[in-house]
């Protein structure tokens, strides 16, 4: 069975050669930033019904993200989605899972989430909000803080 992979054109430009090397029996349906579709490089105006979709990080910077997401949710023959998100609790994924669509995610975002958490912990321990308020008021005043070296943390992730 031939498959049609839906992805953003920006992603295709990055990894298209590797995708093409996977199979000769794979049609590529790429959406550009204006929301236009190209099937195997040619403009495509007909209805789309991909069997596979790749929702990479580019999607969350795309001005046509809603159109792409609608194409995914409206695809009657969709069988598999790869997402860049950590969790699958987003409403779009709940509906796909109920339809039996296979959903895969990766841990590619884990380092940036870890950086964010460490930044939040430092902000809390160093009282960044208090420091910024004093700075905005042009007040110099020492701010007490806790050192991290004597602390133990337990971080629980749900994604």
Which positions does each model-derived feature cover?
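Active-site-adjacent beta-strand anchor residues
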Residues: 5-9, 82, 155-156
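Short gly/ser/thr-rich secondary-structure transition/capping motifs
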Residues: 31-38, 60-65, 134-141
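Short secondary-structure boundary/capping segments
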Residues: 44-45, 93-95, 144-146
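Glycine-rich NAD(P)-binding loop of Rossmann-like domains
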Residues: 131-159
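N-terminal glycine-/charge-rich "phosphate-binding" loop or analogous flexible N-terminal tail
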Residues: 1-59
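Phosphate/diphosphate ligand-binding glycine-rich loop within oxidoreductases
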Residues: 51-132
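A short, aliphatic-rich alpha-helical micro-motif
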Residues: 43-48, 72-75, 148
């Amino acid at each position: 069975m031939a498959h049609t992979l839906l992805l953003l054109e920006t992603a295709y430009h990055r990894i298209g050669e590797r995708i093409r090397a996977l199979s000769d029996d794979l049609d590529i349906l790429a959406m550009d930033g204006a929301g236009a579709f190209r099937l195997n490089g040619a403009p495509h105006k007909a209805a789309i019904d991909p069997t596979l979709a790749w929702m990479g990080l580019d999607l969350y910077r795309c001005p046509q993200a809603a159109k792409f997401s609608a194409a995914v949710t409206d695809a009657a023959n969709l069988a598999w989605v790869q997402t860049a998100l950590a969790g699958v609790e987003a409403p779009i994924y709940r509906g796909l899972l109920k339809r039996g669509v296979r959903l895969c995610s990766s841990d590619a975002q884990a380092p940036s989430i870890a950086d964010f958490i460490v930044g939040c912990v430092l902000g809390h321990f160093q009282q960044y909000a208090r420091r910024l308020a004093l700075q905005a008021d042009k007040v110099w005043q020492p701010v007490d803080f806790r050192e991290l070296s004597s602390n133990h943390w337990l971080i629980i992730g749900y994604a």
